[in-house]
Structures are given as structure tokens and as C-alpha cells.
Amino acid sequence: MATAVSSYNDIQLETIQEVSCSTSCSSNSTTSSSSNSPKQNKVSPGYRNKPQQQQHKKGHKMGNYLLGKTIGSGTSSKVKIGTNILTGKQYAIKITKPKRIKERKEIEREISILKRLKHDNIIQLHDAIYEDDVGRICLILELVSGGELFDYIVARGRLSEKEGRKFFRQMLCGLIYCHSNMVCHRDLKLENLLVDEDGNLKISDFGYSNIIKPGNLLSTFCGSPVYAPPEILLEKRYNGNEVDIWSMGVILYAMVTGQLPWTLTDGVQVEGMDRLLRGEFKYPSHVILSDDVKDLINRMIVAEPVERATLDEIKTHVWVNKGYDMEPDQEYNKKVSDRLEKEQQQQTPQHQQTQQQLQPQSQLQQHSPRSPKPLFVDTIIGSNRPLNQSSPNLTIPQNKQYVSSNSNINININNNNNNNSNVINNSIKPIQFNSSSCLDEKKINCSAPTSPHSISPQFISPSPSTSTTPPLSPLSVSGQRSPPTFSSNPNIGHIPNNNHNSLSSSQNNINTSGKNQYHHHHHHQNHHSTSLFHNIFKKRQSVTSVSANSSPVIVSSNGGLNNNNHNNILHVSSSNINVDGASASAPQFSSSSSKRRFSLEDIVKAITIRSGKGKNPKIRSMKGPFNSGTTTMLNPIQLIEHIEENLNSTQISYRRNFYVFDCKTLCPRNETINFEIEVCKVNGMDMYGIKFKRLSGDAWSYSSSCIKIVESLKL
């Protein structure tokens, strides 16, 4: 056991450095490089670009994303909130800096696995950015606002069997999907299960996951000791599916009892290791559990892997289906089918007719929840050098320009000579367009593969220091990653050079004559915006500009978070940047290609004007979780003063921002713990409460600190 743990000590990554926008753009001009010096940053008060330079110092830019607050960190990565400057939508950006080829392969494997998984109960990867100059790989992940299931259980003590059954069914449904796509997670634990704002579960952090090959066994020591089965702790060869089932049993035990079957003595060593290796544990005497849930836990936590319950046995268990009409995977498949049917009914008859003409009938079922599919395909400009020759799924261009393509997106090209927009499917003929604002008048030919998925150009990065790979947990990753095992995925490909598919004579005319007209009008500044702005404002048929009709939604400028959002770091909903055409400082998207270039400074100015600085935000109203120790009849001002006195007496450093306290303390092992205390109103009652949120640090030490604070407050 000790020898296995010591094998992690040979990998130590450097601290991840943050690069400002001015630094990332230094290769473009000498002006931007000179602005990075300390002397240039200290400009005089009368300097006209002072507001922009101040904004650059506050927020860092990575590709098309403004980096905000850190919401998680580990030994090899850190997770930040990132705001897309084009859409205003927020994501969780996982930043890693590999030093060795092995570490880079592990990140490649994680990206490759996330590319093939498309499920509501699995965290989604939207994009991946590789920064060649600083050696960073950034994963743009879905932002889950509810936090970890561990914190959810700590706030409630334990879950009822009904609520635990709901989460367990969702976890089981996501795991069935992973195993059906030959992926084992190998690091299932409460910290890697996230709860969204709707109370649904999502599996995250696939850093230890691997591809299952029939007949091959795995031998890597990975995962957390409390959740790892005996075969991993004894360094035996094992089957990845059986490892996940053991971890599911430990998670279910923790949900319904509020504690783990085994405890850690110093955060690493398991107390009672001999009992763990034999699969022996006891249920707490003060918790009353049904015989069905005990039987299910006893079937999953079995020392012998071959005697452990299978997924088919678990999904048909009496306790799992109690109160439900269908099994978990059947219920999910029905929900997805109903959702797709509802979306098809909402489409206009003309759009349905167009889809039937351009797509074969077999493609209507391409969103099957059990079949993997590629999410994105890359079109690389100028270079096809892969990040690592052993992986076909991650391609890093030598120059920093890229075109990222999203599946199932049609390009609408509006021609001034024809009022009716021509809907062209990219999977039929190559579409050629010119973007002088992004690629300096370089022509790009984008053609899609002969796959059943229609693909279109989506984004062209204006940043010369970043290159993007096809999208394929926003949580901290600890320890050494297991050696990657690559598997060729036929569903994930690259865009070929030529495509000879054709439809009919009328459609061929669109691709031949319309293409020349398109280039002709583009150089006369008469053509309309293409898929870049069509994808951003898809509800508009004519995407010539952004009008003031779009709903004004404010996005923060202080590192991706303003004072209003700061009260709720993880409860952030997707929003759009309001670019008002009537505002003199806001950028406008025009049909002219020369006006399509807009800078970060314009976006930041528009955000700053709309952010409403200095206004005291309203206190949030929440349903819970609350108990008698975290609720009070005191008004918010009195409660804030009471919390400040308590934090000062306990020597916990903090910084208050309206109703939120950013706290920092040290655990007994001298590890820093960052967490939040938010004052909020209890929904439907005339009383107020406090809510704790862990940002980084040891989970158990954080739980002990919260208990001490609640006890000392004496609300």
C-alpha cells in the first residue's frame, strides 16, 4: 500500500500561471508587447485608455473567455469560472499544465473520452484550448451551479431513502451509458458528483477514466482509498466495470447514513484497512434503514469482484425501482425521446421539409442516448501537426488560427439579390467563405465528412496565442493520472479535403452560382453575417446586426463576476451579453466585414456600463438547506455583524462582499481551506439563514470548520 502511494511523488506540476489578455496578444505587435511592462501599466490619470488597462489587470482572457474566480484547485489543475465574450454564457474552465509527455497523453485521453459521452447525467465538454506559448491545456466544461453532492449531504446530515434513490438512479443511468460506450470512470466519489440548479446529478472528473477493451484487464492504482475496491488497493489486475460498482455501493452507503463505511486517519490511510479488504462494514445504530437498501449495498460492496452485483442486477433491484414505473435507463430514454419529439413539433413546416430533404431518415435517430457520437470536428488552417501522434482525436495546429465546427448546424447565407435565405447543408458541398476580420483575408475551405452529422464552421479565434481542439469536471484533480489507453473512435473524425456528394440540380445551383455571388458581394460589403453570428443569434433570419431588441442581460466585468453575481458563485445561469446598438460604447455587429472585428476593450466597456457598480444587491431567497443552527430571526445587518464578530474571534481571515463572506483558514495539516458564507432569506418565511460553500481544500476539514462556526454562532 505504501509503495503504491509513493509512486505519485514523481509527478509534480508547476503552479499554473495566469496570462493576461495583453500578454497573450504580445506576438501581434510591438505595442501590445510593450504594454506588458510594469512602467506602462502605471499610466497617468489623463491617459485615455486608462479604463481599458485597468480592466485588463482585473480580468484575464483565454481565447474567447474572460477568466473569473477560482472555484476549485488540485495538485495538477485548477478550475475557474469563464465567461464567453461572444455569448455571455459562463463555463467551468479546467486549466492544466502538463510537464511530461505522459501527463499530456492523460489529458488527451480525458478529452477523447469526454468527446464520445453525450448524456444528461454526465458533465459536458464544450471546447478545449491549447496554449502553445505557456504549455497549458484548458478544458471548457459545463458549469454546474449546485456544487458537489458531498456538500449537499453535509448541509443536510444525510439523505432520506427517497432522495437518495433519485440521485442513485441518475448516477446509475449515467454509469450504464459509460459502460455501454466502453468507458470506466474509476474515480466515483461524492466530490465528483455534481448537483445542478434543478437538483439533477452529473458525473464529472474523467481524469482517471479509461477505455475498456474486451479481454484486457487494468492494473493502474488510482482513485480515492475510501472509495477504491480491494483489487486496486492490493494492486491486482482488475475489470474497470467492477471497480465502479464498488464505488457506487460506498456512495449509496454515504448518502443514506451520512458517513462513510471506513474513515481516514490522516487523510490518506484508511482506518481498519483489513476490514475494507474483506468488505466488512457496519451500519450506524442511530440510522434506521430499510432491508431493501441494505441488501443493495451488501450486493455492491463485496470483496470478490466476480461476486459483486452487475449493472443489470442493480437496475432491476426492488429498492432502485420503488415508486418508479420504469428502470433508470428506460426512463431516461423515454425522456430524451419525448424531448426530441417536442422539439420537432415546435419546428416550422418549412424547416421540417428542409430537414427531410437534406438528411436521410436514419439520421433522425442520431441522438440515441446509448450511441456515442462526435460533438465537434476540427478544420486546421496551415498545419495538421497532432499534439501526440498516438491520438487521432486531439489535433493542435502549429499556427494559432483555427476553425471549430459544431455538429447539426446549418449555415444560413443571406444574399442581397435574393430576399429568401438559402439554407445550405454543409455535409453536401464545401462552403467557402472569406473572413478578413479574423484571418487577414485568408480563404478557408470547410468541407464536412460523409458522416450522418451535418457540420458547419463555427468560430475563428482572433487570439494568436491559443489554438483550439474539438470539444469533445469542473473539479480539482489530485494525484497521478493513470497511463492512457487509446482506442480508435470511428465516430470522431477530421474534415476531409474533398466531398463529392450531391443532392439535386436545384441544390447544385445553390452551391455553384451562389458561391461566386457570395464572394462578389463580400468584397463589396454587401453580404450578411455567416454562421459565426448566426450561431450566436440563431433566432434572427437576417443576422446583419445586433439590435436593441435582445433582452438586456448583465454580465460581470470583474474577472467574470460582478457584485451582483458574487453572492452566488456557483448558482450562475447562462446569459447573453447585451450589446445595445444605441449605446455609443457598445460594439455593433454590422454586415460589413470590416466592422465585424471588435476588441475585448469594447466588450469590457459595454459590460462595465451595464454592470451597475455600487448598487447594493438584493439578498437572495433560498429554500434551503437550513436547520435550527443556521436560521435566525435577526435581520441581515445584525446577522452580518454577528458573523463578523465570530470570524474575528476564531481568527478566520475573510473578505466581505455585501452578503457573502470569502473565508480562508488552515486545517490541522496546514492546508488552506477556502469557503464562502452567504447570508440569505429563507424562502416563504420571515427569517434569515446562512449557507456554506466550499471552494477548495480538504472536504472533511471544511466540514469540521463549518460545524465549529455554527456552534459558536449560537443562532
From Swiss-Prot:
State the protein's name.
Probable serine/threonine-protein kinase MARK-B
Which stretches does UniProt call biased (Basic residues)?
517-527
EC class, as a word, reads transferase
Instruction: State the family it belongs to.
Output: Belongs to the protein kinase superfamily. CAMK Ser/Thr protein kinase family. SNF1 subfamily.
What GO molecular function annotation could you give as one example from this UniProt entry?
protein serine/threonine kinase activity
Task: Tell me what organism the protein belongs to.
Answer: Dictyostelium discoideum (Social amoeba)
Q: Where is the composition biased (Polar residues)?
A: 381-399
Q: Where is the composition biased (Basic and acidic residues)?
A: 335-344
Show where the KA1 domain sits: 666-715
- Provide ranges: composition bias, Low complexity: 24-37, 345-368, 451-478, 487-513
Q: Which residues are annotated as active site?
A: 187
Tell me the residue numbers annotated for binding ATP.
Answer: 71-79, 94
Q: Which UniProt keywords apply?
A: ATP-binding, Kinase, Nucleotide-binding, Serine/threonine-protein kinase, Transferase
Please report the stretch or stretches of sequence annotated as the Protein kinase domain.
Answer: 65-320
Q: Which reaction does it catalyse?
A: L-seryl-[protein] + ATP = O-phospho-L-seryl-[protein] + ADP + H(+); L-threonyl-[protein] + ATP = O-phospho-L-threonyl-[protein] + ADP + H(+)
Where does the record place the region Disordered?
A: 24-65, 335-399, 446-530
State its Enzyme Commission number(s). 2.7.11.1
GO BP annotations, alphabetical order: protein phosphorylation
